[in-house]
Design a protein with these regions (language model features):
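Short, small/polar residue-rich loop motifs at catalytic or cofactor-binding pockets
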Residues: 15-18, 77-80
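A short beta-loop-alpha structural element at the N-terminal edge
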Residues: 1-4, 63-64
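Tandem CBS (Bateman) regulatory domains
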Residues: 10, 29, 34-77, 91-121
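N-terminal non-globular leader segments, chiefly Sec-dependent signal peptides
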Residues: 8, 12-15
Length: 121
């Protein structure tokens, strides 16, 4: 919600174990606020700012049916930390670079049967 404050955003992130939250106004996605955005707001003494005030860029939005490879490539090329995922025009979730890394690790393990060692790069 665009009217939520920094404290509410922190609580939501902690409750759900996430580092990005969508900022919406009704059914419209205004953007994404990250943990880093909240740290910056607090460091600047802007604890009273609402989430709508923290959103500064147009979100990277993809449809549910988009290819993960295409989305991940676009995120990497554009240096974007998250993508807002819509399903039939409605917010379905957020895909983060962390999500992509976890999936990549699973695929690599499945296909290459990587030994589980501490010697990893």
């Amino acid at each position: 919600d665009a009217n939520a404050d920094v404290t509410t955003a922190w609580a939501m992130m902690e409750e759900h174990g996430i580092r990005h939250i969508p900022v919406t106004q009704g059914d419209i996605v205004l953007g994404v606020v990250s943990e880093r955005d909240l740290w910056r707001a607090q460091a600047e003494g802007r604890d009273d700012i609402d989430m709508g005030g923290l959103v500064s860029t147009i979100p990277f939005i993809v449809e549910w049916s988009a290819s993960l490879a295409d989305v991940a490539r676009a995120m990497g090329t554009r240096k974007i930390g998250s993508a807002v995922v819509l399903r039939d025009g409605k917010l379905a979730g957020i895909l983060t670079t962390t999500d992509v890394c976890v999936y990549l690790a699973e695929v690599l393990e499945e296909h290459y049967h990587s030994p589980n060692t501490d010697d990893a790069a």
